[in-house]
Structures are given as C-alpha cells and as structure tokens.
Amino acid sequence: MTPIRYELIKTCKQTGARLGILHTPHGSFETPMFMPVGTLATVKTLSPEELKEMGAGVILSNTYHLWLRPGHDIVKEAGGLHSFMNWDRGILTDSGGFQVFSLSEFRRIEEEGVYFRNHLNGDQLFLSPEKAMEIQNALGSDIMMAFDECPPYPATYEYMKRSVERTSRWAERCLKAHQRPNEQGLFGIVQGGEFEDLRKQSAQDLVSLDFPGYAVGGLSVGEPKEVMNRVLEFTTPLLPANKPRYLMGVGSPDSLIDGAIRGIDMFDCVLPTRIGRNGTVMTSEGRVVIKNAKYARDFTPLDPNCDCYTCRNYTRAYIRHLIKCDETFGIRLTSYHNVYFLIKLMEQVRQAIREDRLGDFREQFFEQYGFNKPNAKNF
C-alpha cells in the first residue's frame, strides 16, 4: 500500500477546484493546502508548536541544504527529520535540483547527474537521481521529490525538449533507487516550460511510471502570472485525478487561489517568512510595508480582521519599531502573521469549494486585497 494517498471529497461546481484529503504516514490533511518552508529543518523564527497552533499540516525541508549541513547521516542517526526537529505531522523534502540550478555559479549537467560547486565553500559536489534518493531516504520525509533538471526561464524549445527527456530518464532512475517505497511516497515533477506539447510529453512519461503524486515544476521562475495560469490550464488535466497535484514554489495569495481553481492541491513557498523578515505583511486589505513612517503612531493590529497571536497582542507601531531596530522578535511577529495568513486563506478556499462559490470568493478577495487595481503588486 502506498504511504501517500489522495481522497477527493468534492469538486467546486463554480470553478472545478478540488477539495480533498492527503493521507500521509504522519496524519491526514485537507487540501488545497499551503505548506510552510523550513529549509534547514526549521521554518525561520517559528517553533513546530507555533506551526501546529496555526494549523499547518505538511512542512517542507530542503535536501540540498540538509545534505551540506548537518549532513543526512546525522539526521538519520537522530531517527529522521521528524524526530530531529520534533515535528509529528507531514514533511515533504524537495530533491535539491532547484538549489543546484539556482545557487551554484558553476555547474555541469551530464547524463549521470550534475557537477556543481558547494555555495558555502566552493568544493566540487555531485548530485544524481540516486544520490538525491539516498539523502531523502535518510531524511525520512513522508513525501520525496524526484531529481529533475530545472531549466532557466526563458529557455529555447530545443533546450527544453532535451531537458524534459532527461528529467523523464532521471525520474525512472529515482524510482529504481528509492529504498523505502512503503514508508515514503515519491512524486514525479512535470517540466516543459511554457510549451504545451512538452508539458504533455513530460506528463505522459511520468504518469506511465505511476508515481503516488505529481508536481508541476518550472513555474514561478520569473514568467508572468498569465503564463503560469495558462500552463496550469493545459497541464493539470493531464495528471491523474486520484493523485495529489503539487505546484512548486508558489505562495502569493492570488496564485494560491488561481492555482486551486486550476486543480492544484498543494503549494509551498518561502514568501511569507522572507517578506516578513523585510517587514512586509499580507493583510485582508492588501500588503503593508510596516517600516513606512506612516505606521510610527499606528496603534492598531497588522490586520484588524486577523485573530493570530501577533494581531491579538501587538500593534503596527510596536512591530515597526522592532523591525527598524533589527530586533528578532519583530521578525518573529511578522513571520507568524504571514504564515498564519496563508494557512487561513487556504481554509477559506476550502470552505468556498465546499459551498461551490470559489469564483465569487476570488472576486471578493482580489477586490479587497487590491489585486484588481492597475499596477497591483505581486503579493
């Protein structure tokens, strides 16, 4: 029996979005869901207890970073990631592919894998499908990702075609190398850029290998939102309806709603903690850059419609003061609020699917948040 199972509960009559349950070895979680990112086995500044209190079900950790520090052997010795970081809900690990392609100045792609430089000290490293499986098997995540090539955006059709073919061959090698198929579910990653025929080829190749779940990769890499939505429109229908669908690296509120409408079940992004560290927060009325002088004497919560720990206890003026003074507590408060905001947004999305009104919810949310204004900012 596969360790990862998807159960479809309902399809929204208004939009076609899916309400479902993702069953994992560490619990069952409603989808569509947002997964906070804990790159180095921690969601920056937040404790596992706080994440639970917010309602997080699955969190993400990063294969590449944990391989370098502290080393997958140490995590394995600790009893796996769950035990190492004291998290008893779901964990998804990415394959390390994206980091190899985004962090390393120097890299050489060969059929057997990728040679690249360690971004910390410049040492030469080699990552292959087999190595990515070995690391993730040691980490013991509930969901592992296949090692794929992450092409740059934009890329030529010829480059993308070769890349898709290589990713399919690597996916097959990942399945063969996966040592714990009864404990950890391995997802395939559909690539192909913005080319419909290549997405189709990639999806067909991977579906024929019968993974327990599928990710759509190569989006949110700099392409316009319209391109991402168009690619999702022709890609998600190619994936099996009885398996979970995961859109990698996407976390802005508009893209979460638009992704769900296009049949996506799982999302992850560093966005809430990254912008939180810069003093930017998402609220029901749009984006607030808390460092701005106009908040110096604003003694109201970050978001008057939010009941998170931050909004129940602290004011914009106080949080602005902390952020301006580089106080860690300020970053904790903005990060807590932002992660909570996206987890609650997905609860609202699920409720709207239940009531067949996700299209109406989208209109209302976009209007309130300010996405409908000309020159609206991304998040």
UniProtKB/Swiss-Prot annotation:
EC number, as in UniProt: 2.4.2.29
Start and end residues of each stretch annotated as RNA binding: 249-255, 273-277
GO annotation terms (biological process): queuosine biosynthetic process; tRNA wobble guanine modification; tRNA-guanine transglycosylation
Originating organism: Anoxybacillus flavithermus (strain DSM 21510 / WK1)
Required co-factors: Zn(2+)
Annotated InterPro entries: ArchSynthase1/Queuine_TRR, TGT, TGT-like_sf, tRNA_ribo_trans-like
Pathway the protein contributes to: tRNA modification; tRNA-queuosine biosynthesis
A Gene Ontology term for the protein's cellular component: cytosol
Protein name from the UniProt record: Queuine tRNA-ribosyltransferase
